[in-house]
Swiss-Prot record:
Organism this protein belongs to: Aliivibrio fischeri (strain ATCC 700601 / ES114)
Protein name: Glycerol-3-phosphate acyltransferase
A cellular component term, taken from the record's GO annotations: plasma membrane
Entries under CDD domains matching the protein: LPLAT_DHAPAT-like
Keyword field: Acyltransferase, Cell inner membrane, Cell membrane, Lipid biosynthesis, Lipid metabolism, Membrane, Phospholipid biosynthesis, Phospholipid metabolism, Transferase
Residue span of motif HXXXXD motif: 305-310
Family: Belongs to the GPAT/DAPAT family.
Membrane topology: Peripheral membrane protein
Length: 807
């Protein structure tokens, strides 16, 4: 670097230290992007800019990356560690050519790779985004705009403290040299690809231009679909067309968002304070997959599970910090109260009524509004379960919004539409006490400002929060596979509902929920809750609890549930100490040590957290249950039993294993239990290991309540084969409540009618019921007997006594 540049950089650093405050995306690029610090690194920036270069320098040094202003040595000669892909702006024009010095460096590096087979330099495309404010609809500015000196100065004043250093995945120059050669044309190609990449990054970060709200309403009013229903409504109600048109405008006002970037930017500071006050940390996983989709131009639909009202804020906050545009969020109309409603609306919320039934005008307007969001390229978010889960389990999907998403595709969208399942988890859900009261029968309290204030007074440290992005689902690919002729149903005017729509939407919904559960985050509290709720009297010595946590951790690490599920990196001792600090357990000391237990109220609340991850342990728990019951059992017998029971677990817990994968995964779990010395193996025979029988019993207990529910329903079917769906659900629920009361099963979902509904549907799907819904006893009886054998004598006696009383 020349002396002049060195002096210039020194003079710039002081004002930039005051004017510029940057965040890096990703926040840990060395780990997230797998950057190898042992291999040479060269940075590629979009424009020649000393301000950008110094901003990158500060960020790189903070992140542990090489200083871009330190030279790189090639064959004994020192060269700059950076290239610019265009000369960039001058005072009155812009030169988009690749600078000669950058071209020369590219040629030198590529030739070095041609001459040295072991050379493998890393090219890291890096851009500095000065502000992320989207433009206004109708304006035409480039997505990544070069700035001359005066423009850059103004930008620093306006957005210097709202800047982002965007670091992209590494490009291997060894790969480029081997596959594309090392001549000058490749250098130009690299520069062109980088420019496209930088522009897509900018669009992904700021999003499409925002519409004028009134212009949007006028455009919707003129759409053929809404105009048609307005005329039909006026005619059927015998009122003036203008009156219906005003109603339509009022509905649009009720629904539509009023997105404000300034609220997002300023709200980010408040939310940062809030998360620091509430949580000891936020754990975000697999965000790079979503960034890639955004940069490739996908229409992204986020479909998170719904644990808490906090989900609305948390996901938008996380996406903003991951360099993505916060989505337009479908929120229940119950949240449209002052002052929260207007704030949510400016933060991207659009409001939806609980039911569209009988209101054709509303349903048409809402459908057209959603289609407009997709057509303009705004990312959208809606909660897959419809409402918040009160039990901690993933609920069956509500398919209305999903169906409208597919219908929007049938309007002729020219971009791929991709669902991004999101698992959101907490070590404390603020509403969990309220959920417990509602499950006991208390009426749900309507959301209001007073409720918000009461919640704010309870703010304290709630441990860790988790946002795991699951495996994306391409709707285009799914439709191509399951409805190959779907494009024939495209109609830009009328909403379509072809014959294939309902089964395809149901299939997508099930896949969506499965991918959410695949991305589950086990944590200190959920693991402790799982162990303590499996113990007699809901109590364990500290040593036993630590050992059980270690058992769970080994299962999750050695037989990973999925590629997107996450497991704590800490050991069992550290997890337990962290969980104890959350102040949810009773800690007692005696002469033998410490006992960790749950009081009755906390036992009820802890079922919520256990249910977050119960699916992770469904199969190992069932294997343990079979070994505990039989003392000695063959692997083949275990495989046969699990094949019978698995379809019910799969439907209830959204397990992802296919039938052909089941044998292999069961064998893997058996191997793990043998490895942990929980069971002993002699050839094909398994038996209890008395030295570790306590740990095996605790593992086995996790699935016990699920099997008890199955036994209840199957016993009713055996006794009354012609029992209808509603009667079976009602009678099973009554018996489950009796069992819960008599045997201290302090878990509200144990007698949840919805769970019995899923069981009934699975019985029908699997052929245990005939076309009329009557039990096929030749199939029901063997299954019922197999499951009954796994129950304790006390539970079996209670079920028998209740059935005798009913008779």
């Amino acid at each position: 670097m020349s002396t002049g540049h060195t002096i210039y950089h020194s003079l710039l650093k002081l004002p930039l230290s005051v004017m510029v405050k940057s965040s890096s995306i990703p926040s840990n690029p060395i780990e997230d992007l797998k950057i190898d610090l042992e291999r040479p690194i060269i940075y590629a920036l979009p424009f020649r800019s000393h301000v950008d270069l110094l901003t990158l320098q500060k960020s790189a040094l903070e992140l542990g990356l090489p200083d871009p202003l330190s030279p790189i040595e090639i064959e004994g000669v020192k060269y700059p560690r950076y290239v610019f892909t265009s000369i960039g702006p001058k005072m009155f024009d812009t030169d988009d050519d690749l600078p000669q010095e950058s071209l020369d460096l590219f040629k030198i590096v590529l030739k070095h790779h041609a001459d040295n087979p072991d050379a493998d330099f890393q090219l890291i495309p890096t851009s500095i985004l000065w502000g992320r404010k989207p433009g206004k609809e109708g304006t035409s500015k480039p997505h990544l705009m070069p700035l001359n000196g005066p423009q850059k100065f103004v930008t620093l004043i306006k957005a210097g403290r709202d800047s982002t250093v965007r670091i992209s995945p590494v490009v291997s120059l060894r790969y480029m040299a081997d596959n594309h050669g090392s001549d000058e044309a490749i250098a130009h190609k690299l520069a062109r690809v980088a420019k496209i990449h930088f522009s897509r990054q900018k669009l992904a970060a700021s999003g499409p231009n925002l519409p004028n709200r009134q212009a949007l309403f006028n455009r919707l009013l003129k759409s053929q679909a809404i105009e048609k229903v307005i005329l039909e409504e006026a005619k059927s109600r015998n009122v003036d067309v203008e009156k219906v048109r005003k109603e339509a405008m009022g509905i649009m006002e009720e629904i539509a968002t009023n997105f404000s970037y300034s609220l997002i930017k300023n709200g980010n500071r408040i939310l940062k304070w809030l998360w620091n006050r509430l949580y000891q940390g936020l754990n975000i996983n697999n965000a790079s997959t979503v960034r890639k989709l955004a940069q490739e131009g996908h229409e992204i639909v986020y479909v998170p599970c719904h644990r808490s009202h906090m989900d609305y804020l948390l996901l938008s906050y996380v996406l903003y910090h991951e360099g993505l545009v916060p989505p337009h969020i479908a929120a229940g109309i119950n949240l449209n109260f002052f002052p929260a409603g207007p704030i949510f609306r400016r933060g991207g919320a659009f409001f939806i009524r609980r039911s569209f039934k009988g209101n054709r005008l509303y349903s048409t307007i809402f459908r057209e509004y959603l289609a407009e969001l997709f057509a303009k390229g705004y990312s959208v978010e809606y909660f897959s379960e419809g409402g918040r889960s009160r039990t901690g389990r993933l609920l069956q999907a509500k398919t209305g919004m999903l169906a409208m998403t597919v219908q929007a595709m049938l309007r002729g969208l020219n971009r791929p539409v991709t669902l991004v399942p999101v698992y959101i988890g907490y070590e404390h859900v603020m509403e969990v006490t309220t959920y417990a009261k509602e499950l006991r029968g208390k009426r749900k309290e309507k959301e209001n400002a007073g409720q918000v204030l009461r919640t704010l007074r309870k703010l304290r440290n709630f441990g860790q929060g988790y946002v795991n992005f699951g495996e994306p689902i391409s709707l285009n690919h799914y439709l191509n596979e399951h409805a190959p002729n779907w494009s024939e149903s495209i109609n830009p005017i009328e909403p379509q509902k072809p014959e294939w729509m309902t089964p395809v939407v149901n299939g997508i919904a099930n896949k969506m929920m499965t991918h959410i559960n695949d991305a589950a985050a086990a944590n200190a509290l959920t693991l402790c809750a799982t162990a303590l709720l499996a113990a007699n009297q809901r109590a364990l010595s500290k040593e036993d609890l630590t050992e059980q946590l270690d058992c769970y951790l080994q299962i999750l690490r050695n037989v990973p549930y999925s590629a997107t599920a996450t497991v704590p990196s800490e050991d069992a001792d550290a997890l337990l100490e962290h969980a104890i600090k959350l102040d949810k357990f009773v800690i007692e000391k005696d002469t033998l040590g410490e006992i960790v237990s749950l009081d009755r109220n906390q036992s009820l609340l802890m079922t919520y957290y256990r249910n977050n991850i119960i699916h992770l342990f469904a199969l190992p728990s069932l294997i343990a249950k079979l070994v505990v019951h039989h003392d000695t059992i063959t692997v083949e017998q275990i495989q046969d039993q699990i094949k019978l029971i698995y379809p019910f677990l799969k439907a209830e817990l959204f397990l992802h294993y296919k039938e052909e994968e089941l044998t292999s995964i069961v064998n893997n779990h058996i191997d793990e239990l043998v490895q942990q010395n929980l069971i002993l193996r002699d050839g094909d025979t398994l038996q209890l290991c008395n030295a570790n029988i306590r740990k095996l019993h605790l593992l086995a207990h996790t699935i016990s309540e699920t099997l008890q529910r199955y036994a209840i329903a199957l016993t009713h079917l055996q006794a009354s084969p012609d029992l209808g769906k509603d009667e079976l659900e009602e009678q099973s629920q009554i018996m489950a409540q009796r069992l819960s009361r008599l045997h201290g099963i302090n878990a509200p979902e144990f007698f949840d009618k919805g769970v019995f509904c899923i069981l009934f549907n699975t019985l029908k799907t699997e052929g245990y019921l005939d076309e009329d819904g009557a039990a096929v006893l030749s199939k029901v009886e063997p299954l019922s007997q197999d499951i009954a054998h796994l129950l304790t004598p006390e539970i079996k006696l209670t079920i028998h006594a209740v059935m005798t009383k009913e008779d």
